[in-house]
Design a protein with these regions (language model features):
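Active-site environment of divalent metal-dependent phosphoester hydrolases
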Residues: 38-40, 64-69, 90-93, 163-166
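Active-site neighborhood of phospho(di)ester-bond hydrolases with catalytic His/Asp-centered motifs
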Residues: 33-36, 57-63, 84-87, 146-147, ...
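Structural signal for conserved beta-strand scaffold positions within catalytic alpha/beta enzyme cores
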Residues: 6, 13, 85, 139, ...
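Conserved beta-strand hairpin/beta-sheet module of binuclear metal-dependent hydrolase folds
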Residues: 2-52, 154-170
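Metallo-beta-lactamase
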Residues: 91-153
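Short, well-ordered coil/turn elements that cap or connect secondary structure elements
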Residues: 8, 27, 51, 78, ...
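A generic "binding-loop/recognition-motif" signal
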Residues: 18-19, 65, 89, 151-152
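Active-site metal-binding motif and surrounding structural segment of the metallo-beta-lactamase
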Residues: 40-86, 129
């Protein structure tokens, strides 16, 4: 776990609980897609970057769930990299109390403010209009925003009726 794996000419991934994409901008500069779930993930990612003589220029967050932005704060302090995402995800990244508040429907009680639901705040520096050259944003809604629950829909999963709420992509 936490090993760098090459999958294309300029593309890699770091094997970890929330796999991290890595794209080479040139021989030394890279961007990563998401940053893992906490400071320790950030530390391990930073170690891999140093071992490969990579300079982190960007973190591109796919969304603001804590397991995708938890390493942002550590990596941004260490590397002064830029952090970019959509405008709304940037707000959740800058003000992580929004994540458990959104989940709970109000100000969260203490047990909802753990590292699994609330990452350390980091400072987004731009939005997806500022993607590095060679990268393109393709919206694939459905994992967080752009999804809604429908309690009146039932599917058959593996031939067995599945009566629980299903997420529909808008």
């Amino acid at each position: 776990m936490y090993s760098l794996n090459k999958v294309g000419e300029k593309t890699y991934y770091i094997d970890c609980p929330t796999n991290i994409g890595l794209y080479k901008l040139n021989d030394t500069d890279v961007c990563i897609i998401d940053s893992g779930n906490d400071k320790e993930a950030g530390r391990k990612i930073n170690k891999i970057l140093k071992e490969n003589n990579f300079n982190l220029k960007y973190i591109i967050n796919t969304h603001s769930n804590a397991d995708h932005i938890g390493g942002n704060e550590f990596l941004q302090k260490r590397t002064e990299c830029k952090i970019i995402s959509t405008e709304i995800e940037n707000l959740f990244t800058k003000y992580p109390i929004l994540e458990p508040s959104f989940l709970y429907g109000g100000y969260p009680f203490n047990k909802l403010t753990n590292k699994f639901l609330m990452a350390k705040a980091s400072n987004p520096t731009g939005n997806l209009d500022e993607l590095p050259e060679g990268l393109e944003y393709i919206k694939l809604g459905g994992h967080f925003f752009d999804a809604c629950l429908s309690a009146d829909y039932q599917i058959v999963l593996f031939g067995i009726p599945y009566p629980y709420p299903i997420i529909h992509v808008l």
